Amino acid sequence: MAFDIHGFIKELLEKRKVFHNERDFQIVFCCELLKKGYTVRPEFYFDEKDEENKENSRRKYLDLVALIDDECIAFEFKYKTAELEENIGGEKYKLFEQGARDEGVYAVLSDVCRLERVIKNNTEFFDKKITKGYVVFLTNDGGYEKGFTRKG
């Protein structure tokens, strides 16, 4: 059975709706995968080879790689926040306005490109090729829903 990323995230967000930062979200995501019995490796390092320009070859990492139902899946995470100061379930959250939405979108697109290269280059984890990748973008900033225009 294929991994249902939407169902997994929905289930995770029912347990916890707010995170202090991107690392907090990554840890909770990783723990939920572990609870389900999956093998996970946060900050999975790999050698990215550039066949056209060998000097561009370098060591890179993915936020998370998991072995899920015999399928190797890579994950990249982005958590972009608007200002929020609230007590939720007895826990105080203070999120800062990150702004620069254009840079946030660029970072997401860079992650998509990295995942595409990882899959194309047959990167392996536990002797299995990474065959699927997800960029998980989480935000409380409604500005990301409005889209972008270029002025000038």
Q: Model segments located where?
A:
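Interdomain/boundary linker segments immediately adjacent to catalytic/signaling cores
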Residues: 1-35
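Short, well-structured alpha-helical interface segments that form or flank functional binding sites
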Residues: 20, 24, 28, 59, ...
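A short acidic/basic microdomain associated with nuclease active sites
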Residues: 33-65
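A general structural motif
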Residues: 37, 70-71, 130-132
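A structural signal for isolated positions on well-ordered beta-strands in alpha/beta enzyme cores
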Residues: 41, 73, 133-136
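Active-site beta-strand-loop-beta-strand hairpin of nuclease catalytic cores
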Residues: 62-77, 82-84
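Catalytic cores of nucleic-acid endonucleases
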Residues: 79-146, 151
